[in-house]
Amino acid sequence: MRCPFCHFVETDVIDTRKLYEGEVIRRRRRCRACGRRFTTYERIESVSLMVVKKDGTREPYDREKIARGVRTACYRRPVSAAAIEQLVNDVETAIMNTDEHEISSQAIGDAVMQRLRDLDEVAYIRFASVYRAFTDIGKLREAVDELLDREGVRNGHLSPKPAEDS
């Protein structure tokens, strides 16, 4: 592995850890020339998957594009980087398990929204406002109302949960 600081090609691995249930390996390395340390990540290379966009064009699947969208939606929200990474991993796993060589951008967006709804409601609304391209405040309000109905919240108050039979 080439050192990002001095570009020397020989480095030593000083620590290795599995992340995200073994889906990613994190390696801490030290350059043999300059002695500086850096981190690398290893993951399975994704298959050649094409994303079919709304206008019919196709582009290669890009995990980082999903991660950027989720990070933007979660900006200044109490969502950890690890939670965002796990969400992206979950979406990617769902996409790869379809065994298709093409997937619509809508299917990817729906998978992200489904998981964001459970992670952070404000991030969900932020993502939905861009993904669904709300054209007016009424559409945004519908999305918020849908979320509130799902959570049992109306007019700022929690709706009572149904009584459980003992």
Curated annotation (Swiss-Prot):
One of its GO terms (molecular function) is double-stranded DNA binding. Residues 49-139 form the ATP-cone domain. Keywords: ATP-binding, DNA-binding, Metal-binding, Nucleotide-binding, Repressor, Transcription, Transcription regulation, Zinc, Zinc-finger. It comes from the Bacteria. The keyword Repressor applies. Binds 1 zinc ion. InterPro entries: ATP-cone_dom, NrdR-like_N, RNR_NrdR-like. A zinc finger (unnamed) spans 3-34. GO terms for biological process: negative regulation of DNA-templated transcription. Its cofactor is Zn(2+). Negatively regulates transcription of bacterial ribonucleotide reductase nrd genes and operons by binding to NrdR-boxes. Belongs to the NrdR family. This is Transcriptional repressor NrdR. It comes from Chloroflexus aurantiacus (strain ATCC 29366 / DSM 635 / J-10-fl).
